[in-house]
């Protein structure tokens, strides 16, 4: 049997959250005709010279028109459903990934696989990604607040649009054999904001924030609903370890991480996250 978990997805029972549109952008000069396609913007000039269509790949700059809402895409080549709720399916509606009342309002990094719906278990292949990291030790619950503002100020200073998810990497916090929270003091964590493309800023240090490239990797992932924190991570890891026990041809290849897709204004019951373990086939 495969590990399974159920979540409330009845929109009549869970309020459908709405994100306040607060992200300000710099003024954009109006043009007579502008059309947008997936990942590109076409505009026509109005001077006396012959009109020229200009195609520009979206850079991900916060001041660029449409920076906060590039079109989401399905990525079946990067995702394989292997357990949990095998019938759960996400949809793309109104420019957002959705599952029941849960939604993802911000764009994913370019090339990232689609999100795993709550209750489903997927094998997923992630490309390399450039990210801004804030690392510390101690309580990751406190760290989620402590790390957010240095990271937010970093992307604000560099005019980089917010993406989703916010990533939490955990070291020494969970028993590698069971996924249960370990009873020890030597725990540390890293919170990361992910760049949509690596062209946005170079690697290096910006105060307490480090910009670095994370290599490509394969993970076993379960989608979750619920308040963000170590409790939902522990629950998800227990289910992933259950799947691994039934599939001994895979082994754990790294520390666990969590993807947080929503901001604090979203009701806890419909917050969308993923709990992931890097894995590989045994030789």
PLM regions: where:
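A solvent-exposed interaction/effector surface
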Residues: 2-283
